[in-house]
Amino acid sequence: MSSGNTSSQNHSPVNNQPTRLKSPLPALHKDTQPNTSHQATNVLQAIEHARHFLPAQGPISVFVHHNTLHAFEDLPFEKAVIEGGRRFGCEPYLSEERYHQELLRGRISREDLREVLMADLQDDADKLVATFGTRYTLRLSMLQTELQPMPESGLSWVLAESELLKRFREEVPAPYREKTITQTRGWVMRHLEPITTDTTSSNPASPLPAPLQDRLKAAGESQIHRWNDQQWESFTLHALWETCQQGVEKAEVQTPNTASNDSLHRLMRGELGIDLKTKIDDVLIRFCGCFLDQGFADWKLPERENGFAKAFADLYLGRWAIRADWMKHVDASLREVQSPDWDAIQSIEQSLERMGISNNECEGFLSECLLSLRGWAGMIWQMETNGPFLANPIPEGSLNEYLAIRLILLAHAIEHFGKAKFNVGTASEILRLALKSADVRSASSVRSRTHTVFQLAQLGGWTPEQMLNMSSAQWRCLITEIESFASLDRRRLLHAAYERHYANQALDAISIHSRRRRELATNSRRRPAYAAIFCIDDREESFRRHLEEVAPDCRTASAAGFFAVAMYYQGADHASFRPLCPAIVKPQHYVREEPLFSSMAAGERRAVRRRRLGWFAHQVHQNSRTLIGGWVTGLFGAIATVPMVARILAPRLTSQIRESMGSLVRPPATELHLERLADAPGSDPASMGYSLDEMSQIVVRILQDIGMVDAFPPIIVFFGHGSGSLNNPHESAYNCGACSGGRGGPNARAFAVMANDPRVRRRVAEQGIELPDEVRFVGAYHNTCNDDVDYYDLDLLPRSLRELFRRIESDVIETRARNAHERARRFESAPLDLTPQEALEHVEERAEDLSQARPEYNHATNALVTVGRRDWSRGLFMDRRAFVTEYDPTVDDENGHILTRILQAAIPVCGGISLEYYFSTVDVEGYGCGSKLPHNVASMVGVMTGAASDLRPGLSQQMVEIHEPMRILFVIETTPEMLKKIISENEGIRRMVEGNWVQLAILDPSTYTIQRYIDGHFEPHVVTDREIPTVQSSMHWYRGQRDHLGFATIQESEIKTPVSSSESDANTSEVLV
């Protein structure tokens, strides 16, 4: 059996796609009988270690962004992507072709390549390579042009049918091309022998290779003198090829044979011609879907409460069970599963012994088996351990039972299909014989090496004469050097250059802009007209920026979007509680939205009506699948297509009609059950909510985090955020990450209620923050998909503040249109000449379009996190690519407690979002979930591709198609000493920072100078760009553009008087003229 070379990645000659890294097979020994005595402890430890590699994504309704390679965070990023790629069969970086496209369009510069290569080589940069200069110059040449690997099987066709030996590559500089042709022509003419009539022999004394002599003889001496430029170019390339091939043969560099290191399933597929994995997966996919079902299926799986294994055995031992032929002898094993004393771990031990898997191979083998259906296996583990509020929880031990059943099926499949070829009946003997017969092949060939050297010779201006004069030792040195810098190493450095380019642009822009802001010497402590507090989400960056342009006298700030209100929340229309806090936090408090006391009876009647309607709709859905229901659906089903077609052809109009009909019966006014009467929190009515002391701690924490401890404006609006769209199974992934994929409106509302309570304010004052009586907090919800904004509890706003609130409302309306206009430029279906109001209508339509696969782009393009005062980043156009986190060093203490708690959330959360986007972009099929278009919801817990596949964790193609995969860059306003202290004292932060999973820089609070964190120490950032553009408004910078944009300074607007909504729309449209 052949095995791929995992040290580098080559492009296929057909589709030019990178070869996938393969996962290792446990080292099953061919010639020795392994020790297969397994102890339960060893098996449990092996399972515990193997399950770390399973996806950590829970049910899709609570989608939480996280580092896809979380199991490898103890390794540096550069090693982790290789190990993860090998284990999961995925790509660690973009393809070389993609990086070179970025090089050609200027996204990577030659200077970036030189800097990252020099940093990588260090003292080895000046090592000489044959006669072609240094290691640095050779590798730089290899980085600057895409080397197109070609296997032996494809070279014959390319040599015969393409222009490989007729035209130089387009990337070859013209001077190199002319020099090579001219020098080759002179070399040939100097050694041109008189043409003889004997064309069957070559002159051994001639320095020209024999094939070139034959070519010259075939042309004839008189014709050679009349060759044009194209003919000499072709001859030069033939000469270059022949000398390269001769040199490769002369070098005699041996490629070590690689032992079979493939997976067991690929081994058996190669030996038997049958994919055992597919056979087993077909059985388990359907059963896992039934077992994990959360209400999607019509029938409940029998015996589900008895566990995975017993339910499986009962189902497949049933009288009407339908089984594949290879499962006909599995009855005895399944009957053992039905016995009361059956144990999953003992069953796993027996299966390992049956297949001859030794103790040393146990962990790797079990890991391979779990990862065979890693989506389903990961979901079983997540629902077993992290599913307290599932409608249908699963029993403890389900993952072990899943593995036990899989191994039983695998052993039977090996014996069933292997017996015919190897004429033995035991799984262990079949595996031993299969390994013995596996082929071992060499990883490289003479002609494929020749092709690589041939490409470098063109790019480097190496002449045939120069290469013909090289010794065998020099050729060995050259080939060894080339092969030591394989595709994977080149992609690693190309990616480093890709990241460096953006990081330098970002740090230059922040340095220049912060200096400009400092020169303005504005007083940040003056009392603003009002304040707007947002989540740190990158989608809110543009909303904040536009609001600041519309209302220069307002102040904006940001904090994690759960606003320190960690709770299990149940809305008035929700069937159950759900967590609204970061995934790393386990809430202790329960909050419920309830009708006002005066509307309790109306609320109860509405709840009864909703339950009845829900029951009726469920019955209609269920009965439509029966025989009679099918007839009825066939007769009257066409009527149901009317609203569906309307949602596709006129989604916005359909939405308005639906909302108008819904307004006929408005829901009653509600309030939050927020104050707790009991001593301890819980889910019963008396235990719901927070104590007054807990409320005051939450208010103090957020006000300190955002640096708002004095000069309070009359109204402070807290904007939670979420996203709403149709036909989008991943909708929770578009919601607030700080709320575990929930919507942050209830958190903003709860915070506002807490901060407005006079009893809470008295306790806050005791901690040093005086909130004046006239200051009011308002909760709001921003829908990032359609840019709609809703406000909570406005009836509680004093009449004296209503005029100011109307001004806020007007500013927000204009901001919505401007923000939608900036967002719409990224949508191909939105013309670039839309007015802001038309853009707002466009995004509203996208959110209601049943056929829309891209309602919004979510966190796509995220690349930067700023942690510091808004003073130095206000007015900086960051293209919706930055998480903007508020932090005021002057409010913090000498130990940095405020910064520590901010970074404890920001680095794992923002880093996790960035890394999930990174991995889903570099391999959207392996780490991501592919295209949304063939997805089907499975069991209400995830999506499958088509009718039956593994669950697809990760992000879809439509979510990452405009993303640039980079490790996120943190720019933190603090000192080196403070940040080093925080890193050393916090393991989670230390692992992410020292492992290079995130990039780090600091902005000095006093001097605004920037230093980068590199290999454990800080280095000053040298600004290369002295200026960045200054524009009148954001629209003046981005209009007419669809691609990523650079940084720019937005001119500070003068404070304007309030304008009406219609006037604001007209003024906004005027800017685009």
From Swiss-Prot:
Query: Bias regions of kind Polar residues — which residues?
Result: 1-20
What cofactors does this protein use?
Answer: Zn(2+)
What cystine linkages occur within this chain? none
Could you tell me where this protein is found in the cell? Cell inner membrane
One GO molecular function term of this record is: zinc ion binding
A GO term from the CC aspect: plasma membrane
Question: Which InterPro entries does the entry link to?
Answer: DabA
- Per the record, the coiled-coil ranges are none
| Membrane topology label | Peripheral membrane protein
UniProt-annotated stretches for the region Disordered: 1-35
Chief place where the protein resides:
membrane
Q: Which residues bind Zn(2+)?
A: C535, D537, H721, C736
Superkingdom to which the source organism belongs:
Bacteria
Q: Which UniProt keywords apply?
A: Cell inner membrane, Cell membrane, Membrane, Metal-binding, Transport, Zinc
Its biological purpose is as follows: Part of an energy-coupled inorganic carbon pump.
Q: What HAMAP family does its record include?
A: DabA (MF_01871)
The UniProt subunit note reads as follows: Forms a complex with DabB.
Please state which protein family the record places this protein in. Belongs to the inorganic carbon transporter (TC 9.A.2) DabA family.
Protein name (record): Probable inorganic carbon transporter subunit DabA 2
Organism the protein comes from: Rhodopirellula baltica (strain DSM 10527 / NCIMB 13988 / SH1)
